[in-house]
């Protein structure tokens, strides 16, 4: 063997041993990466199989809920149409008179101010949210102020609450407490201006 051959043989042998050392060091790293990749792909495959079994159930539930909402919309529209088609009976003069009488208002049946029939639209317009006029507030005050002394005292309040069927009106002490909370002059009664302030704070 010549020197060149010997040198190349030694170089080859040393490079071969270096390769073996580096491959023996990299094998555990590649094995670990391989293990995690295989585990990950198995997990993805299992998850895909698992969820694919339940996907038709999810789609079915979605279809059922969409169908139910469409049926509900359809039924609502049918009921709305039936309601529109019914004759609008509204309120008759006697019904309005009964309500006015229970509130202590004049109920002269011969009064032409009361119509013979009120449609449901007219009744709903009565309850639209709008700011009451001063005259309407005065009329409301007069409902409470039966003795027309210009004040609402606990007895006046109790009378109206009892007529309206509210249980708070059954106890006179409850009525006194309510009056005290709005009584600016601390005399145990509310005057018209206090009533106006109450209405402004609560309804305007």
UniProtKB/Swiss-Prot annotation:
UniProt record, GO biological process: negative regulation of defense response to bacterium
Pfam families: EF-hand_7 (PF13499)
UniProt keyword Metal-binding present: yes
InterPro entries: EF-hand-dom_pair, EF_Hand_1_Ca_BS, EF_hand_dom, EF_hand_pair_protein_CML-like
Gene name of the record: CML46
Sorted UniProt keywords: Calcium, Metal-binding, Repeat
Annotated Ca(2+) binding sites: 145, 147, 149, 156
Molecular function terms, GO-annotated: calcium ion binding
Signal sequence interval, chain numbering: none
Role summary: Potential calcium sensor.
Name this protein carries in UniProt: Probable calcium-binding protein CML46
